[in-house]
C-alpha cells in the first residue's frame, strides 16, 4: 500500500470523515500504485454512479467503429418511441450539444413504466447558461445503442468493454453472493432550501442514483447514465484496457477527448468543458474534473457517490478513486437565500459536522468534489512524479 496515497486518503476517511471508505489506484507506464482506508478492500463493490457514462460512451464509440451506428442519424431512426427527437442527431446527445428535458422529473415517477413514458417523451432545446452536463442524453443513448447493436445495454457493455478488458467484477446486477461486499449508500442526508431530506432504506445492489433506482432497480437492465457496480481491481483493468486501445482505437479516444461545449462567457466565467459523454480539461482547475497532471487528450468523469476516473491515453496515465460519500453523510446543502455554508456550522469548503433535527451529528461531504485536487490528485502526482501539464501543451 502506497504511503503517500494513504496520507491523502486519510484526510477524507479520518481527518474530516468526508468519506466512510476510499480506495485509490493510479498508474503511469507499467507502474500501478494503490491504497485504501475506511470500510474498503479489494473485494469491496462500489456504485460507479455517473462513471457508468464512460462505459456507455466507449460502447457507442465501438458501435460507430464497427459501422453499426451513424451519429448523423436522428435518435428516432433507431428508436421511434422518441417521437419528439425526430430532428435530433445522435451526435447531439453524445456531445451534450442540446439540453434534453422530460415532461416530469424521472425520480418523481412512482414506477418504472411511468418513468419510461416520461423518458420517451423527452424534448430537446438549445443549451443556455454555464451548465451543459446532464444524465438524460446517456439515458436515451442506451436505447439508441440497444437498437443499433440488437442486444441489451448490459450485454453490449459486456462484449465491448468488460470482456476485452478482462473485467470479471463489474455488473449491472450484482450477483447474490457479492451483495455482502457492496458498499452501503443508506441514510443520505440533504438540505435543500430549508427542506430536510433523509433518504433511507436503499438496498445493496440498487443504484444510488434516484433515476436509475426507478428504471433499473436490481433488475440488471442497465441505464446509460448510471447503474454499474465495480471493484478497484476491475477498474484498474478498465483503465489499462483503455490506455492499451483494447476497447476502442486511437481515433475514437481522441474524438472523445475533444472539448465540445466549453467556452468563456462575458462575465469572465466559462461553460462546462465536456467531450463525448465525459469531461475534458477545464482552463480553470477549480472547475476541472480532469487533474492538472493530465493533458488535452485526457478525459474522465466523477460519480456522485464519491468516485472519479480519468485517463490520459497520450501520456499513458490513469487515476481511479472509489469512495463512499453517502453513507450517513450530509451530501447536499443548498442554503436558503442570504445564507452560506458557514451559517449551518460547516466550514466554507463544505467539510465539518451538522446536527440533524433529531440530534444526530453527521459528517458533511458537501463540495467533496472540490477537495480532490489538494488531497488526492496532489498525492497521485507526487507518487508518480508527474508535473503539472499546461493547457498550452
What are these regions (language model features)?
Residues 10-13, 127, 264-265, 293-299, ...:
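Short, P/G- and charge-enriched loop/turn segments at secondary-structure junctions
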Residues 9, 24, 56, 60, ...:
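Residue-level preference for non-acidic, small/hydrophobic
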Residues 267-268, 289-291, 322-323, 330-334:
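Short conserved micro-motifs at the rims of enzyme active sites and ligand-binding pockets
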Residues 16-23, 38-93, 123-136, 223-226:
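Short active-site loop at a secondary-structure junction
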Residues 221-227, 296-310, 324-328:
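Glycine-rich phosphate/pyrophosphate-binding beta-alpha loops
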